[in-house]
Amino acid sequence: MAAPSELQLYPSVIHPAIQKYWDEFCELPAETLSAFSSYYPDILRAFAVSDFLALNILREPELVLSFLQSSQHQKECQLVDFRAPLAEELSGALKEDDLLRILRLFRRRMMFRIIWRDLVCLVDYQVTTREVSWLAETCIDEALSWIYRDMSQQFGEPHSTAGVKQQLVVLAMGKLGANELNVSSDIDLIFTFPERGETQGGNRSLDNQAFFTRLGQRLIQALDNTTADGFVFRVDMRLRPYGQSGALALSFAAMEAYYQEQGRDWERYAMIKARAVAGDIDAGEELLTSLKPFVYRKYIDFGAVQALRAMKEMIEREVQRKGQDGNIKVGRGGIREIEFIVQVFQLMRGGRDVRLQQRNLLSTLECLEDEGLLPVAAAAELREAYIFLRNLEHAIQGLEDKQTQEIPKDEEGRERVAVAMGFPGWGACRVQLDKYRDCVSEHFADIIAERREAPLERPDTIEWKALWAGRLAQDEAQDLLLRSGCDQAQEIYEAVTQLRQSSRVQHMQLQGKERLDEFMPNLLQSLAQSRASHETCRRLLALVEAVLRRSAYLALLNENPGALTELIRLFAESAWIARQIVTTPLLLDELLHSGSLYTPPDTTALRDELRQQMLRIPNDDLEEQMEALRYFKKAHVLRVAASDLRETLPLMKVSDYLTFIAETIIEQVVDEAWETMVKKYGEPGYEDAALNDMRFAVIGYGKLGGIEMSYGSDLDLVFLHGASGDLSTSGETSIANQVFFTRLGQRIIHLLTTKTASGDIYEVDMRLRPSGNSGLLVSSVSAFQQYQEKSAWTWEHQALVRSRAVAGCPGIRAEFEKVRKDILTQHRDPAKLRTEVMDMREKMHASLGTKPDSSGSPPYFDLKHDRGGIVDIEFMVQYAALRWANEYPQIVVWSDNIRILEALGDAGVFSQEDADKLCDIYRLLRAHGHRLALQNLPARIQTDELLEERRWVVAFWEKVFAE
């Protein structure tokens, strides 16, 4: 049967897609086709705008026909229209498989109805988002009720210590919280409960937290797991307190304490839309009322502008890195900018004006207009743009029922989206889209965005343009370079000429070549004026070569001359920084923000930033998570190095920050690995059933443990767990606890060390674990303690001096610290200790110390391994700590050499003068090491450098180890 004449109403490029579905549709039985005949125009439109609708029509034609004949597509639903039928269907669910099947079929049926009405009937987008939100709310609440009843049969019902019955509260964040859920969105949830206590009336009692954690886990699986029938909603729990490392369900008291003591600006932003959607709704709303002072400050909070600006800048960087210019949510002039405009007023003034404490964006926008906070015209333009963008978002997502805000890359996809939007073709749709995005971007810039510096005017660049273009003779070019302050004119001229004549430049595309031709004269003039060396020029030209095929970086530098100035300075001062930026040009983005470039964030800000970045990455996108971790490390280490060069950070702070960065990444990696393992195998079993946390910790040794990391430091790690006995994990695929923790450790190492296009994060050395490479990858705390007490060598106790817990379960970390203290403060035979420490030092020097050259003298001094160097000081510190900690346990409270030396001086083990002298020399040697590392040079100096300090260390060694 030929397609109806209405086919000609659609762009020709999508005719093949429509025809394909129509041909399959025509294979249905004749009587079915006859029943559909009055709906052919709508069927044709469905084929044109949505693969999801088309596939469901072909898969379940009788169901679709019933839907059309009952006129369901013509009426708006209420919440009860979702709840009543699902509750009735679930009343017959006898086992969990029934629950999962019924939920998924119900979701598919109702989502078909919603998307049909949205894309075929063109109902108001607010009707669509409200109905999707009601669908999600219904599925969550009905699934929760079924699972709660099922669990209560085994464990009884939760009660507070006062005997009051307890229910889980499910808080919806984001779009669901505001009743604005997209047709293909995931749902952001937080689980909480009123009070601690335990279950009553079951075969086995559980404390409330354990009960609600299990309940939450089963609810997530019921909604999120993909079966043969599909899924219900993808669930994201990362907005809960402490993120992925936090408990799945917290009591109200714990929730309030977290937000009052540790809540971040971005969490204020997230809580604006929070709403209780399932479980004890009344209790949930009471909790949210108690949290309002955290979200809405009593004073006018202008700091909210900077917080949202920082969030937006972070998103912009991500958009640039991922090439998401076509993303109508996070891209320029997109939905997120409108949300930020509205929410900045809410956060600033919501504490003083309760009318701004709304979840719905359009209602809040109207309030801003009424209050005169936004001009009437601006509010109208933003409202119109928002509705257009949300409709476009639905058209994009409804195409395949996928969560995406990216404009289709293919012509057919764009034309289908345009048809769904009511346009004759993509061209007209794009014109309207560009108009709205420009409008939103302008309003955002007026209200929130910082002004970018204007391109620097350079009236004297004619000569530099001629030099780059090759229009100057060599002597003229070199004279220009010399006159402008460049001493190595010939070398620079030759390097520039070689680049210009290279095949890569000759074969550049037009846009890239134009950007290069604009950039190079500015670069050359800036180089000359800064009196840059040939080496600096060589480094910068290497960067230019690296970005020839990614000329957007050249555009970035053309538009931000301040960034070019910073770039030249950094490249002149550090070969290491130059190498980092050449291999990872994305780091150029950091130069746009000189404020943050020279002020590295503290630990709290680091954790907060990384957590926000990871929240925006789908849970199942491992590759993107790994890339984000690698960029995070490189960007923040660059900030430390830049501050180091500018001398805004002293040596000890440099090491502190480098260590903070490592700890932050390790914490995130542990959380990611734990979540993956638990999802696959369930949680480890514990003899104490009340335990339900991670019971795993990472111990840092060496530079990490001693808070003394440098730019190229690797990680010396030991993994410990707190499980005992022969128990197994709780998942369907159950494995022994020891196997679980071993695989967890392997996963952590994999995430840290796997080389991607961006390299690895850190190299990891596990040889300091009990029994070294032949030992278990992860030991129990008790086994670790037994090994340290009975089997460890003296050098292993030396290593323990510079160890500390850096990530994981607080309980296991505390247990390790106790073991460390007990081992380090035990009594030792002084003579035996002295001999063993000296023997180990001799072995190290013989293996790693500098060997004489043909003249019989060492050619250089190795700062670390040679006599009078860093290792000598470290060995003296470790020896003194092991020798005297039994009498002065305060010596080993800290794990870093400086504070141990200070403690040795305070205790009188070393004289105060000697302790201070050792601290000064140790800092001096390490400062030289840092400077050399920033030049990509080994930690070596000339044999006649630092002679006095080295000789003093050697003499003090003799004094310390004198019999």
Swiss-Prot record:
Residues covered by region (Adenylyl transferase): 461-963
Q: Where is the signal peptide?
A: none
Gene3D superfamilies recorded for this chain? 1.20.120.1510, Beta Polymerase, domain 2, Glutamine synthase adenylyltransferase GlnE, Nucleotidyltransferases domain 2
One of the entry's Gene Ontology molecular-function terms is: [glutamate-ammonia-ligase] adenylyltransferase activity
EC category name: transferase
GO terms in the biological process aspect are: regulation of glutamine family amino acid metabolic process
**Record's keyword terms, sorted:** ATP-binding, Magnesium, Multifunctional enzyme, Nucleotide-binding, Nucleotidyltransferase, Transferase
Write the Enzyme Commission number(s) for this entry: 2.7.7.89, 2.7.7.42
Q: Which InterPro entries match?
A: GlnE, GlnE_rpt_dom, NT_sf, PII_UdlTrfase/GS_AdlTrfase
Report which reactions are catalysed by this protein. [glutamine synthetase]-O(4)-(5'-adenylyl)-L-tyrosine + phosphate = [glutamine synthetase]-L-tyrosine + ADP; [glutamine synthetase]-L-tyrosine + ATP = [glutamine synthetase]-O(4)-(5'-adenylyl)-L-tyrosine + diphosphate
In this record, what's one Pfam family?
GlnD_UR_UTase
Q: Where is this region: Adenylyl removase?
A: 1-451
Q: GO CC terms on record?
A: cytosol
Q: Which cofactor does it need?
A: Mg(2+)
Source superkingdom: Bacteria
Q: Do you know which HAMAP family this protein is assigned to?
A: GlnE
PANTHER family linked to this entry: BIFUNCTIONAL GLUTAMINE SYNTHETASE ADENYLYLTRANSFERASE_ADENYLYL-REMOVING ENZYME, GLUTAMINE SYNTHETASE ADENYLYLTRANSFERASE
* Family recorded in the similarity comment: Belongs to the GlnE family.
UniProt function note:
Involved in the regulation of glutamine synthetase GlnA, a key enzyme in the process to assimilate ammonia. When cellular nitrogen levels are high, the C-terminal adenylyl transferase (AT) inactivates GlnA by covalent transfer of an adenylyl group from ATP to specific tyrosine residue of GlnA, thus reducing its activity. Conversely, when nitrogen levels are low, the N-terminal adenylyl removase (AR) activates GlnA by removing the adenylyl group by phosphorolysis, increasing its activity.
Q: Which NCBIfam families match?
A: PRK11072.1
User: By what name is this protein known?
Assistant: Bifunctional glutamine synthetase adenylyltransferase/adenylyl-removing enzyme
